[in-house]
Amino acid sequence: MLTMLIAGHDTSTALLAWTFYLLGSHPEIYRRLIADVRTALGAEPPGASSGWQPPLLDHVIKESLRLYPPIHIGNRTVVEDMEFHGQRVRAGERLFYSIYLTHRDPAYWQNADEFCPERFTHGRKAPPFAYVPFGGGPRACIGAAFGQVEARLVLGRLLQCYDFELAERNVRAHMGATLEPRPGVRMRVTRRSGQ
């Protein structure tokens, strides 16, 4: 558990920052999400074992991960010689792929650059390996489920108790170890009355 908390610190931070940026940039979705959270929680804090799963919050998290995957590059070692787009690739070589670009590929995603949490409603799924914010296959991130539960609990509680307004819209993606917002996501935070 401690390993997942420490290893996931930067990725969780990036996910939360990008989610607040997207919600601040899309006030109509933010308002719907606030209503969803308030209806689901009332005055009770969210709990991991309470069965609390507001669908819109889950869709917002998935869409944030699609548009701004904290780990934006993946890699795999080639196990046997192959040809890829006319180029010979030898066994043992390492191939890198862009999760960021895959998640924005119009061949897989309608309106690929738009923030549209509804694309995940009704159990809709992307084609295999078109949505891989935690990698895919046997080498997928062991903390994927934990990270999503953590995000749901943190976002649920913050949205339950505070109002957020985006203070600075001029944010760009910086591709470092994680995909981080630069110069950062600045929000005006107001405690909700009665909280």
Model-derived regions, located:
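Conserved cytochrome P450 catalytic core segment spanning the I/J/K helices
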Residues: 1-15, 54, 116
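Cytochrome P450 catalytic-core helices
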Residues: 11-36, 144-160
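Conserved cytochrome P450 K-helix E-x-x-R motif and the immediately C-terminal K′/meander segment
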Residues: 44-85
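Conserved cytochrome P450 K-helix/beta-meander segment immediately N-terminal to the heme-binding cysteine loop
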Residues: 97-124
